[in-house]
């Protein structure tokens, strides 16, 4: 098992499997120290024996280390060494004999280091390397005892009876007299997975200790892998999240034809949490998650999120962790005020426009890296000046539901609308959403929905041939053919780096599923559609200069612009914008400002020219870009080897 995982699980064993023999010589014996890390599960009966003792003259074992009725740990004398040793049968004698006890309750479901130092005339108890007590005892060894006889005592744990606890033990060792318990405490601490304090954004802590989150809103928290003394552990492992009911601990099962209830964001792409493990980096995995389509009020239940390491196959509770109970609040409670905000269009984004002689305009504004939880992502207010509403077959509440929904909710709604509505009705729906939201780019995404879904379904059927999992190498050819056809550009193929980025967006490795493909397609199709139109098509075709160097991440662009002169810029398609986000398929300008800081601005081209103008318009867009005072020189992508 340990060979398949970066975590050596063979170091951890059940407490009931613990067994160690200690030889006690009559004259030469001085002292021994038994040290170990223990993780105790809850027990139903107290007092309970953690470790018991037995030797050849005993027919029944006696307790050595116990939890008393108050859950305090007690170290008891050895029957082979001390006159004060407890009666093996009479449990009441455990508290009557001299012992060493902790002053506080022993913590359960947590790693604790225990050290038991035993000599002829005393015993000491250490907790986490610190001495908590000492007891003077009377030795059974006398000078008249046969010095050639070495006695052995067995220390062990059992499970299943009424006087034992269940748990795990790590690094149990009998130390020689020259080594201390504090030495063992820092030698090889066990590992511990836990949830760090959540960020204040998106999570509220109620008075009852329950987290309150709004359904459909992204929240952030960190999961950390440390050792038991709090030091971060650098292991090449992944952590996966799953949603549970807080009362029963059972998984919240996905309903048929619905998206997963627990989603995570990876480079702006929403994925099912159970399908997208997160890498630990320097002992920490940062999760950006949201709960979708859930309400604690309607479901009458609280939830929690469980994090675990999938490579660890056995059930080790210390290598998994659960959040506080979560109260999921439906977004519908704010629907009235949200609809009013959308109608009034109170949220505006500052922008500057460049207009050329042909009436083509280009919006130039900061790129918003937040998730799409607002109704207006790209502002274009000319739709507000339209005439009164036309007679419309799709009801207003569907329009409001779309405007208020997140990306996943909008995608599901568009699939339903395109299946049950004509092209004219879909077009009218797009116009109405644009009018209510004040954002015409919503209309672009709605009008491409039918073609995006149909093309994507056809592409997957050709790729999969009814197989659930398809090797990535068999996918790339079909993806490239579809992209070049939709983009109306047969002269430029996708590169190896382009496919690497597409695979990252998919969230897959060697094999791709339909869910992986659909995630990628929702990003690729709007990009291909944008490339097919005049202004972008000419720039995509251009080889010298190469205005768009393929599919580029934000990090690659920033790295390429390090140490470049102000005004140097790179054009890229943002990986955080997927259909039906209103800015899907847009272009981002990443550039070095006069302040020597790298900036990102979203370039939204209105009234995009027909594809027949694709060759003549590249120069026009070039002039529009270079006319900006912040832009003066096209940069190049520098990728690591």
UniProtKB/Swiss-Prot annotation:
Keywords: Phosphoprotein, SH2 domain. InterPro entries: ConA-like_dom_sf, SH2, SH2_dom_sf, STAT. Residues 355-384 are annotated as: Disordered. One of its GO terms (molecular function) is DNA-binding transcription factor activity. Phosphorylated on tyrosine residues. CDD domains: SH2_SHA. Expressed in roots, leaves, stems and flowers. Residues 547-641 form the SH2 domain. GO terms for biological process: signal transduction. This is SH2 domain-containing protein A. It comes from Arabidopsis thaliana (Mouse-ear cress). The gene is SHA.
């Amino acid at each position: 098992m340990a060979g398949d995982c970066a975590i050596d699980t063979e170091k951890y064993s059940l407490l009931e499997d613990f067994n160690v023999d200690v030889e006690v010589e009559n004259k030469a014996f001085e002292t021994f120290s038994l040290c170990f890390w223990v993780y105790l599960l809850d027990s139903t009966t107290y007092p309970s024996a953690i470790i018991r003792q037995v030797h050849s003259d005993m027919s029944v074992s006696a307790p050595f280390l116990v939890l008393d009725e108050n859950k305090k740990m007690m170290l008891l004398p050895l029957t082979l060494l001390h006159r004060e040793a407890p009666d093996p049968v009479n449990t009441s004698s455990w508290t009557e004999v001299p012992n060493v006890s902790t002053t506080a309750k022993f913590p359960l479901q947590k790693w604790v280091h225990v050290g038991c130092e035993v000599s002829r005339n005393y015993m000491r108890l250490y907790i986490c390397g610190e001495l908590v007590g000492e007891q003077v005892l009377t030795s059974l060894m006398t000078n008249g005892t046969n010095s050639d006889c070495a006695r052995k005592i067995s220390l062990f744990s059992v499970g299943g009876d009424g006087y034992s606890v269940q748990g795990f033990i790590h690094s149990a060792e009998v130390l020689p007299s020259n080594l201390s318990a504090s030495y063992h405490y820092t030698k090889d601490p066990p590992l511990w997975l836990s949830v760090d304090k959540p960020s204040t954004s998106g999570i509220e802590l109620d008075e009852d200790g329950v987290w309150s989150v709004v359904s459909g809103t992204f929240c952030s928290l960190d999961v950390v892998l440390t050792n038991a003394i709090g030091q971060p552990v650098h292991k090449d492992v992944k952590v996966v999240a799953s949603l549970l009911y807080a009362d029963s601990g059972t998984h919240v099962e996905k309903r048929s034809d619905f998206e997963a209830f627990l989603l995570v964001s990876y480079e702006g792409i929403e994925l099912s949490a159970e399908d997208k493990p997160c890498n630990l980096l320097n002992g920490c995995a940062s999760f950006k998650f949201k709960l979708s389509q859930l309400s604690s009020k309607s479901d009458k239940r609280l939830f929690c999120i469980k994090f675990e390491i999938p490579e660890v196959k056995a059930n080790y509770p210390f290598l998994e962790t659960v959040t506080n109970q979560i109260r999921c609040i439906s977004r519908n409670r704010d629907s009235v005020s949200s609809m009013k905000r959308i109608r009034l269009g109170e949220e505006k984004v500052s922008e500057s426009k460049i207009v050329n002689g042909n009436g083509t305009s280009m919006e130039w504004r900061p790129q918003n890296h937040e998730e799409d939880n607002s109704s207006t992502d790209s502002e274009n207010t000319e739709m507000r000046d339209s005439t009164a509403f036309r007679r419309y077959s799709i009801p207003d509440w569907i329009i409001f539901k779309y405007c208020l929904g997140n990306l996943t909710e909008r995608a599901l709604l568009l699939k339903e609308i395109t299946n049950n509505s004509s092209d004219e009705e879909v077009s009218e729906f797009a116009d109405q959403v644009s009018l209510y939201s004040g954002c015409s780019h919503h209309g672009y995404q709605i009008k491409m929905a039918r073609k995006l879904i149909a093309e994507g379904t056809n592409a997957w059927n050709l790729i999969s041939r009814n197989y659930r999992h398809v090797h990535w190498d068999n996918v790339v050819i079909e993806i490239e053919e579809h992209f070049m056809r939709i983009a109306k550009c047969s002269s430029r193929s996708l590169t190896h780096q382009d496919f690497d980025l597409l695979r990252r967006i998919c969230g897959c490795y060697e094999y791709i599923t339909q869910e992986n493909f659909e995630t990628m397609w929702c990003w690729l199709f709007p990009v291909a559609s944008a490339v097919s139109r005049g202004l972008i098509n000419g720039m995509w075709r251009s080889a010298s200069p190469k205005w768009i160097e393929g599919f580029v991440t934000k990090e690659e662009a920033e790295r390429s612009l390090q140490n470049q002169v102000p005004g140097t810029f790179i054009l890229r398609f943002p990986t955080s914008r997927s259909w039906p986000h209103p800015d899907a398929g847009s272009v981002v300008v990443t550039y070095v400002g006069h302040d020597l800081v790298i900036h990102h601005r979203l370039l939204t081209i209105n009234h995009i020219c027909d594809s027949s103008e694709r060759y003549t318009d590249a120069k026009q867009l070039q002039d529009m870009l270079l006319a900006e005072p912040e832009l003066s020189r096209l940069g190049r992508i520098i990728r690591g080897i």
